[in-house]
Amino acid sequence: MYIMKRRITALVLVLMAVCLVFAGCSKPVKADISGYENEKITIEGLGDETINVTAGELKELDCIRKSVTTQSKGGEITVEAAGPTLETLLEQHGVSMDDVSEVTFVASDGYTKQFDSAFFTTHKDVYLSLADGDDPLQEDEQPLRIVIPGTTSDNWVKGVVEMRFR
């Protein structure tokens, strides 16, 4: 009887440990992005054809979750970027940042921000944020917000609908 209790206790402990391990392996994008998961983001320059991806498809890539703070005209802004990195997106299409001489992000309101390859030598982390922590992006930030640690907010582009690579 005593041996049986020990075995049951050991089994319960093993099952609890397995549950804890798998609980820590959940996707970093936990927010409900169903309101914009089917919005298309156009990608040019990663091949001969223009590519259309959705926020939902980007959510399925290897994603990160990072708290990032920057300065804006109104003061300090902190967001919890959740989504893939630019490098992950490029790797998905067989391209390296070394192959890129210029990246342009275009927002739905027409705002455009262009970066040359020299920028990415000092700013290696570029997050394609699909959510702000556990919350979906604000309407003007959807379907994608570019978050670049170590830069001011004018380099963060919200409402991205197009990415161009040269």
Regions found by a protein language model. Name each.
Residues 2-12:
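Bacterial N-terminal signal peptides that target proteins for export
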Residues 12-14, 152:
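Enrichment for repetitive, rod-forming helical segments
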Residues 15-19:
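Alpha-helical transmembrane segments
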Residues 20-24:
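C-terminal motif of bacterial Sec signal peptides marking the signal peptidase cleavage site
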Residues 25-166:
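N-terminal intrinsically disordered, low-complexity segments enriched in P/E/S/T
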